[in-house]
C-alpha cells in the first residue's frame, strides 16, 4: 500500500486569513500537509518529521516586541523553509536581517520584477514581453524587509518594496512578500509546486485513490470486526464517511438517518433510495418530526433554536444507539477545517466558531470509540473521494445546507406549516436555477420564510398570505460574498411559479445584501 504520509509539509500558522489556502494548494499539488500553530515545540516538529516547512502570513507586526516568532528549530531542522508575507519577515529578522514598517502599504495586485532565477522561481514568468521576467501577484502587507540576513540574496522587487522576495539557496530558505496561495497570484500554484516538489523533493502521492485505500485500511485496523454506528444526514461529509466505512466493514456499519422535519423537499426519501437501495447500506430511518417541532415550540431566537435542534438530535440518536447493543464505535464526518477550528485540536489556538448539529455533545455514558476517516481532509478533497466512491456529482456539488436545516431558514418560531411552504418554494427556486443553467454559477442559493403576511390578489379575490425571500450569493471562500445578479426574467419566472403553485405565499422578494455587512444565512 502507498504511504501517503511519507512526504509531508508542515505549515505554521501566524494568523493569516489565507493560511488554510496554503494547505489546500499543497494538497492540490498532491502532497500531504498539516497546519499547526506558530508556537509549536521543537519536540513536536521532530516527531512530525516534515519534508519542508512553510511559514504563513499573519496580522501582527514583526516590529512589535511580543510578535510571534518561529521556533528556532525550524531553521536548524535541515529542511527547506518558505516564508510567506509575515513568514518571510520573521525569517529575515530571526536570521539577522531587519524589518520596518513601510511608508507605502501594499494591498492588492502588484508586479514583481524577478532579480534572480532561483529554484523557487524556476520557469516562472507572467509577462513575456518585458525585458525582465515579472510575476503578477497579490500583496497584503504593512511591514517590509529592509536588510537581508547573511547568505540571502534579493530575488524580487516592486517599486515600493525593495525586497519582495529573497533566498538562501545553500540552506534552501526562501521568502516572498506576496501570497502565492491565492488565485490572484497568477503563477502561485506553480511557485508552490517548485517549493514542494522541486526543492523539498516530495512525491505526489496524495490522490483520491490512494486516500481511499489508506482510509479503508486504517478503519479496518482501528475497528476490526466491531460494529459501528453513524449518524447519516445525506450531506457530503456523512455520505462519504458512510461509503468509506461500508467499503471497509460492510454490514457491521449501522447508519441512523434522523428525519427531523427540517429537511428539503423529498430529501428523506432520496437519502434512503441512494444509500439503502443503490449502495446497500444498513440504514435506520427515524421519523422524529413531531419530536423536533414539539421541542421548538415557542422558541424564536436563532442560537436557542440551534441548541434545541442539536439537543433533540443527540437524544434521538442516543435512543437508537441503545437498541444496537453490540455497537462499540461512533463514526463522525469530521473534516480537517473542523479540527483546525476546534479548541481541542493540536493547533491549540483556534476557538470553536460553532459546533455542528451532529458532532460533539454526545453523552459520555455511551462509551463509544470514535472513528473519523475524513479528519485529515478538506471539503474539496472529500468531494473528490466521494466521486471516486460512486456518489453522483450533482449530490456532491450541492450548495451548502445548514446543520439545523430549515430551522434557521424559517425566521422566528418554527411551525410545520411554515416548513412545508418553505420546502415547496425552495424546490421551485432551485429547479429554475438548474433549468436556466444558473445553479453552479452561484455559490449558494436558498429561500427564507418570513413570519410576516402581505396582501395579494388572486383572480377576483384578495389574499393575505406569507412572504418568502430568495437568496443567492457568489463567493470564493464564504468569508465575504456578493449577492448574485440573477436575470430579471428568471427572478420573475421563479416568483410567479411560487405565488401560483404554493398556496399560502402571496409575495416573493429578493435579498440584495452582501457579506459584510449581512451574513449569508439570515439566522
Swiss-Prot record:
Domain Glutamine amidotransferase type-1: 8-205
Disulfide bonds: none
Residue span(s) of domain GMPS ATP-PPase: 206-398
UniProt xrefs under CDD domains: GATase1_GMP_Synthase (cd01742), GMP_synthase_C (cd01997)
Pathway per the UniProt entry: Purine metabolism; GMP biosynthesis; GMP from XMP (L-Gln route): step 1/1
GO MF: ATP binding; GMP synthase activity
EC number: 6.3.5.2
GO cellular component terms, semicolon-separated: cytosol
Sorted UniProt keywords: ATP-binding, Glutamine amidotransferase, GMP biosynthesis, Ligase, Nucleotide-binding, Purine biosynthesis
Top-level lineage group: Bacteria
PROSITE patterns in UniProt: GATASE_TYPE_1, GMPS_ATP_PPASE
Binding site for ATP: 233-239
SUBUNIT field: Homodimer.
Name under which the protein is recorded: GMP synthase [glutamine-hydrolyzing]
